[in-house]
Amino acid sequence: MNKILLAFFLSFCIQLNAQINGSVVDDKNEPIIGASVRVLINGELSKVGTVTDFDGKWSLELYNFPVQVEVSSMGYSSKRKLIENSRSVIIRLNPDRNVLKEVSIVQQRLSEQQEKSALTVESMDALAIKESPSVSFYDHLGTLKGVDLTSASIGFKIINTRGFNSTSPVRSLQLIDGVDNQSPGLNFSLGNFLGAPDLDIVSVDVIAGASTAFYGPSAFNGVISMTTKDPFDFTGISSSLKVGERNLTEFSVRWADKVNEKFAYKINLFALKADDWEAGNMTATDISADNELNPGGYDAVNRYGDEEYWDAGGDVKGYPGLGRFYRPGIEERHLVDYDTENIKLTTALHYKFNDKVRGIYAMNFGAGTTVYQGDNRYSLKDILFLQNRLELREETGKWFLRAYSTHEDAGNSYDAYFTALRMQDSIVPNQFYSNQYRTMWYIFNRPQVRALPDYPSNTLSNSDFEAEMQQVIANNRDFFNQLHDTTNTIVMNFMEAVYGYSVVNYLKPGTAEFDQLKGHITSSLFTEGGSRFYDKSALYHTQGERRFDTDAGQFRVGGNVRIYTPNSAGTIFSDTSGVVIRNYEGGIYGGWEQFYKDERLKASVTARLDKNQNFQPLLSPAASVVYKANENNTLRFSVSSAIRNPTLADQYLYYNVGRAVLLGNLNGFDSLVTIDNIVEYLGKPGADRLTHDFGYFDIDAIRPERVRTAEVGWRATLFDRVFVDANYYYSNYNDFIGYVIGAKIVEGTTAIDRLKEVQVYRVAANATEQVTTQGFSIGLNTFLGDYQSLSGNYSWNKLTSDVNDPIVPAFNTPEHKFNVGWNLRNYPIKKKKEMLLGAGVNYKWIEGFLFEGSPQFTGSISSYGLVDAQCSLTKDYLINDTKTTITYKIGSSNALNNQVYQVFGGPLVGRLAYLSIQIN
């Protein structure tokens, strides 16, 4: 009977909640923000825990006393504390000289302890975000080891790892609190343009390499995972104001409140305005037949409508000196809206049903205007983005259920390149323009050219005449420049007489007619003769995961289902005439891990099976071993894999750009002819055309990409003060997705009409060659005294196989790059110890490389170096009996204003200096 009563009493006690409150400070009694406080069960870290707020405070609701907790924070030695009652406890951490405050190697998703990670993951914590010298935390990610950042515009930054960089980062996955942040229609994230505000970010992890096993088929080349602040742990009001060059104005406010022990909420508002960098590269494209010296013009990188050229049609003596001539194009700066605007509104409601189960509703709204570069340059104007998330999870991480939806609206977005073409064709069609140009040259310029003293003899053969004529042009370049300028003016004036309205003004930037025509084209859909695209696509996603802890190891199982509902009204996809497109995909995964040799050795195996409705199931296995040789050295080895399903564009695209139709390729494509073959045919005399072989070829249906990666790593502490992390990887890629350009033709039966019709297509396709890459990276971090630290990292990435397959996408990655940084944190100013000084400088060097985008945007990026710097002052105030911390900061990205191209076809990126104030 006594045993029964005792059991009843113990069970009753277990039901009582124990509230623990405390604070974490450093050796100078300054609060430590974002410190981890975790409960130990049987001497091992559990998932029960919290983090400290901006005052270093924390609280936990447990079942009973006593309880042991472990407190840790980057840059400090961990400490374990036994708590026996509910009294508030102060835990003091001492600085750890072996860990840099800003960049750390954090745990891979399957592991429980930092020192036993299976992969190298670059990370930024809340303090590193606050102290970043870059204009935003997202920009600062480009200084991390092995991470590449590309700026297509102020509003659109791209993060990539391990090669095959692109301004359409379809091979990287971006998560915010576990939610895919991609645009449903584009199938990739627009940087952080539609992401989370800086004030609400508690940490950012960049996981390099193939990571499909637990993150899904989009995690092909890496994962950017952002974690936002828990409203139970980070309460109060925070705000920031930033002003800077290029009329930068940024305002952000975060309000979070813990209403009671069960309910908490947060609201974030972010607004940004700036004048974007203008893309004004007027050098000739790599595919231009002529350079800047040609009197008849050339195809410039950021001038559109000047791509096509004409010549004398073989009659070089009838049109002497004409050469190749191009229609004057329209510069991008007259076509694109460079007034960048960005608004973000996020909110989250958290409810604890009990001590173990939490429910979450979260909403993420983004809107604005920016510039995106894909096959063309696009003005993303008035775009809207809305995510809604419902989540139910077990607080110790044993299970979760998550469902979310993402909706987008392209607003008034349009294709800048195609706008120029549509404007020209709506006023004067190209064929009419070229015919009149030749005619005017013959009438007005032929006599002047023939009167030149060094004019060649008409008795020469055509080839010899043309060769000598080229020398005449070179000797009289200014004269021929003037002739071409005059000819274009005559042609346009003639057109005005024919059409009866001001043709010149409609194509002359700055005139009312130009603005009227541009407004008409950009406000009309592609299907209506304009350049605006319609996109109200959406995706719906559900997923769940369960963890099992057994003597045989820890097991995880999970799965997800996703539905894409593209809706472009025929302006992007083949959803015209009432056609409804739906795309379904799903996956299941499982993982196991176990510790051996007193937890010095950890082995793990994972596998994921994915199925898209249009493709066969694909398996993505992974395995790793991590061995802690001693307190200062940890070795790791992993073999991982990933797949990437073709995007909606790869499957369903139907995008008519006038001179070609861009197609998805679900079913294959047959009987195409290469463009080179058609050019060869046109160069033959009539008799030979009848026997010409067009060499028809077929394209197989699109299929998913695959990659396998082997990686080894070493992490160590040297001389008790230098922290080292190094890794080497080798990757093998198959079935890379690119495109093939070909033409559908209709043949006639005679030499005259043998080639009756031609339609050019660009079709999504898989490469047939296997591609291998390898790379190495190393990071070094150390402290200098109590307040200063040095960091440095180096990365080497190499495309190792000799690839001749034109479908293989460009590597677009510098072979060598490095960063060197110095930081000063919380240095107390003499006589005013309540004021703390911070500073940081980072130098980044990137070796030049070939950037291959669309044919218009392919060219060399020169080597460059950039310096980011900041200086901050933090002071505590007592306002209405409330401690308020204010940080004043001055900083600059690219402080030396070294204007560089980071992407070919993009703008020259210069300095962006700023002043900011943040209040907590």
Predicted regions span which residues?
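Short, acidic, small-residue-rich periplasmic hinge/interaction motif at the N-terminus
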Residues: 25, 30, 35-42, 68, ...
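Extracytoplasmic beta-strand/coil segments of soluble accessory domains associated
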Residues: 121, 138-180, 203
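Short strand-turn segments of transmembrane beta-barrel domains in outer membranes
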Residues: 210-212, 223, 227-258, 269-271, ...
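Conserved C-terminal beta-signal and adjacent last beta-strands/turns
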Residues: 256, 340, 384-393, 414-416, ...
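Gram-negative outer-membrane beta-barrel transporters
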Residues: 595-597, 725-850
